[in-house]
Amino acid sequence: MIRSVSFSLGLLVVIGSFVLANKQQKQSAPPPPPKVLMIGDSLSVAGFGDAVREHLEHRIGRENVAFFASCGSSPENWLQNEQVFHTRCGYREKTPTTDVYRDYHNGRRPPAVATPKIETLIERYKPTIVIVQLGTNWMDQTLSDNHIRAVLARFVSAAHRGGVRRMIWIGPPDSSRFSKVQNRIYRLIQQSLPRGDPVIDSRRFTRYVSGKTGGDGVHYNSESGAAWARPVNASIDQVLAADIAARRKVASNR
């Protein structure tokens, strides 16, 4: 009788330990990686964009990265209520299911491509982080501060609508052509983004040398673009790490 009771108690202890261990194992399962949507202009169509996209794919997996770049575009061109912007100088799209590249070939202009809308992309890919590389094409336009602020307010609202996500804004790199107006564009972007959405100041990592960096004072060749991407990727990694840690904490408290 005593042996039977002892055996039963021992069996209960073993079963209880198994259940507890199984529960702890389920709780300690890592959360899914972040999902990233990146959009950009001509600077992302070329080498810089490829370097950032490939880094993200390596870091969190190709299935978690959606990348779009439209030459000549500015934030307003990505907004739902604005006229569709057809780029005629280059387009790049790389997602888990698509791979599109349009650029000049043997001096021939690429076919026009419609720039997608950020609201549609967010609905489709459901990102937890949105990376934006835009603002370059504002530097050669005579737009008022109020106009740019209004566009940025709508853009920020669209990027955050329908979910809790962070936005990382990659500011324009050093430009020998528009260096005088860059401070203004940066100031407006920084003032418009909410706390918690970092602006990466690319000027800290770049210096445009005509004939070496590129030929027009704005665009970066493949080598210079890759060099610019390295410190930008390091900055993005910090945000990704914080996002993963925060979601791991939430998962462990469930």
Please place each PLM-identified region on the residue numbering.
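Active-site cleft segment of glycoside hydrolase catalytic domains centered on the general acid/base Glu
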Residues: 140-152, 215-220
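N-terminal secretory targeting modules
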Residues: 1-39, 43-67, 123-126, 232, ...
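Residue-level recognition of beta-strand->loop/alpha-helix junctions
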Residues: 67-69, 171, 201
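Active-site segments of SGNH/GDSL-like serine hydrolases
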Residues: 131-140, 153-186
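Extracytoplasmic/secreted envelope proteins and their assembly/folding machinery
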Residues: 49, 53, 115, 119, ...
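Loop/helix-junction capping segments adjacent to catalytic residues or to phosphate/diphosphate-binding pockets
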Residues: 45-46, 141-142, 149, 176-179, ...
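Catalytic His-Asp segment of secreted/periplasmic serine-dependent ester chemistry enzymes
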Residues: 61, 173-254
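Conserved SGNH/GDSL esterase-like catalytic core that processes O-acyl groups on lipids
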Residues: 33-38, 43-145
